[in-house]
């Protein structure tokens, strides 16, 4: 029989009414001030309630909790656990490890709950070295047989890909807990081992919503669409998380139209969307260019906001609306939404600048100039957008200026995507020799996208010699892209060199290459695919001369 568990003894405890009514940081600070005035800061029990509220129950108060924690000379382990738990559960759990180090420096001994929180943070961040170090501490402190700690270890090792260690921990005692089953299933699915994940899922004695959602999400991440759909149809107790897994999974796998179809099923089933649903749907509309559905979603957001203090009015939703309108070509609407956002952050500016780059390049550059006037500090994404705008509007001199500005004024080191945008800009303008010299002078190794972009420009302007050189560079990097051969063949054909066309076709047949899968910033017809590459988090190319 699988037992239900909680991760902390304080999870369901009854709290004094004063703290139950503390719902915002302003009230929290008022209570803190009253405690100081009345000399209660030496009472660890009362201070613990304050720290608990700041860490776990008051939205946006975690930094305040850290500040309070720093001011307590001798916290007990319970107070430390409140702060660790809050940090581990937050969107940015990086501070959890340093908080644990501070706890040790103050001479506070950890308990079994302490390690569940730090291991959760290491799992979320996939910090293998830190997690292994904490595994060692667990052994030294004698908590390795504790059921909660063991589940946390299984979660950490499974999520970080150490499935052998996770399997060793997944013994009879661990199998009594559904958390351990879900962790193992998710770990195998995340690493693409769907058959093993499915085997565990089928063996699972009790499948709750979490287990079903984990398995469906795992299949979608591995692009096992049929398996995901089969599981989804079998599951009879779907919640909003289940629907979101399917909708976002289909969008991420390149099936935005099907994602909208699943949303219709969701509404027909009587399930109401949440913020995750809306974000995924707006992304689907942006990919499809489905302006009408995007407008209906916008109306739904506004109607929801008018009747309640809804989560839909947060910055991520406004950013997604701006992105959707810009990518659907509704520039005025995108700017209108942007102007209406009261709490703009850098991502709001970037969303508009990047979104306008393809369809309204002048507007993108104007927004960047406005951003500078308002002293909003740009980042790497900002400059991808503004250089791309210069590329699509033929503003080569301005593009050069912004590339230099990025390094000289803002101390942002260009990455491979900035270099790719510059090559794209010079290539579109027909300045092929300068584009070539720019590639040769790059401080990091050019990747296939850079060379393919130069090759695409050579095709447009009929530069056979430079095209051959770019193609040789591409083939030396990988020999399985037929698109590279097609581009070179087209260069020969455009200049009437039919013997060259025949040579390329023979090379193509001899190497038996695959169909094209790469991207050329110039040749790529689908601008949205290009944007997904530029804004993806793909690993950077190596620095020249660097040994890895």
Swiss-Prot record:
Listed GO biological process terms: RNA modification
Organism of origin: Arabidopsis thaliana (Mouse-ear cress)
Classification via PROSITE patterns: PPR
PANTHER family hit by this protein: PENTATRICOPEPTIDE REPEAT-CONTAINING PROTEIN, TETRATRICOPEPTIDE-LIKE HELICAL DOMAIN SUPERFAMILY
PPR repeats, residue ranges: 76-110, 111-145, 146-176, 177-211, 212-238, 239-273, 274-308, 314-348, 349-378, 379-409, 415-445
Signal peptide annotation: none
Database matches in InterPro entries: E_motif (IPR046848), Pentatricopeptide_rpt (IPR002885), PPR_At4g14850-like_plant (IPR046960), TPR-like_helical_dom_sf (IPR011990)
Keywords: Repeat
Protein name: Pentatricopeptide repeat-containing protein At5g15300
Example of a GO MF term: RNA binding
Family of this protein: Belongs to the PPR family. PCMP-E subfamily.
Cysteine disulfide links: none
KW Acetylation (keyword) present: no
């Amino acid at each position: 029989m699988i037992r239900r568990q909680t991760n902390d003894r304080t999870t369901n405890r009854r709290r004094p009414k004063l703290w139950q009514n503390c719902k915002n940081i302003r009230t929290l600070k008022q209570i803190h001030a009253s405690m100081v005035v009345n000399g209660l800061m030496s009472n660890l029990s009362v201070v613990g309630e304050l720290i608990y509220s700041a860490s776990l129950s008051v939205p946006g108060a975690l930094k305040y909790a850290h500040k309070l924690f720093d001011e307590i000379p001798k916290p007990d382990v319970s107070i430390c656990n409140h702060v660790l738990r809050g940090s581990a559960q937050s969107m940015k759990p990086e501070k959890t490890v340093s908080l644990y180090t501070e706890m040790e420096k103050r001479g506070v001994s950890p308990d079994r709950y302490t390690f569940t929180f730090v291991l959760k943070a290491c799992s979320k961040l996939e910090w293998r070295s830190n997690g292994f170090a904490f595994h060692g501490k667990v052994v030294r402190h004698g908590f390795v047989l504790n059921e909660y700690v063991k589940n946390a270890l299984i979660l950490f090792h499974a999520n970080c890909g150490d499935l052998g260690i996770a399997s060793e921990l997944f013994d009879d005692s661990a199998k009594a807990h559904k958390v351990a089953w879900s962790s193992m299933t998710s770990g195998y699915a995340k690493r693409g081992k769907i058959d093993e994940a499915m085997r565990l899922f089928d063996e699972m004695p009790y499948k709750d919503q979490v287990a079903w959602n984990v398995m469906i999400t795992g299949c979608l991440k591995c692009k096992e669409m049929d398996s995901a759909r089969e599981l989804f149809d079998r599951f009879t107790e779907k919640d909003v998380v289940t629907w979101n897994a399917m909708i976002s999974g289909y969008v991420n796998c390149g099936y935005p139209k099907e994602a909208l179809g699943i949303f219709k099923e969701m509404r027909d089933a009587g399930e109401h969307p949440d913020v995750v649903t809306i974000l995924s749907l707006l992304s689907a509309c942006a990919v499809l260019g489905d302006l009408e559905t995007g407008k209906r979603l916008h109306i739904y957001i506004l109607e929801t906001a008018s009747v309640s203090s809804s989560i839909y009015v947060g910055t991520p939703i406004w950013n997604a609306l701006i992105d959707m309108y810009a990518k659907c070509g509704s520039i005025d609407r995108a700017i209108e939404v942007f102007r209406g956002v009261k709490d703009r952050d850098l991502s709001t500016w970037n969303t508009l600048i990047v979104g306008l780059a393809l369809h309204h390049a002048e507007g993108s550059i104007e927004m960047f100039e406005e951003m500078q006037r308002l002293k909003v500090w740009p980042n790497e994404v900002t400059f991808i957008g503004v250089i791309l705008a210069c590329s699509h509007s033929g503003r080569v001199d301005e593009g050069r200026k912004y590339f230099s500005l990025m390094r000289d004024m803002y101390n942002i080191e260009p990455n491979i995507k900035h270099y790719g945008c510059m090559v794209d800009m010079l290539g579109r303008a027909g300045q092929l020799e300068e584009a070539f010299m720019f590639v040769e002078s790059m401080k990091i190794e050019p990747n296939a996208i850079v060379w393919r972009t130069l090759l695409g420009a050579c095709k447009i302007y009929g530069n056979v010699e430079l095209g051959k050189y770019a193609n040789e560079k591409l083939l030396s990097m990988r020999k399985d892209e037929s698109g590279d051969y097609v581009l070179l063949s087209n260069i020969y054909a455009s200049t009437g060199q039919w013997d060259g066309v025949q040579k390329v076709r023979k090379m193509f047949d001899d190497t038996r290459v695959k169909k094209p899968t790469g991207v050329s910033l110039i040749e790529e017809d689908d601008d949205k695919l290009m944007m997904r590459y530029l804004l993806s988090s793909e690993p950077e190319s190596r620095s020249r001369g660097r040994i890895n």
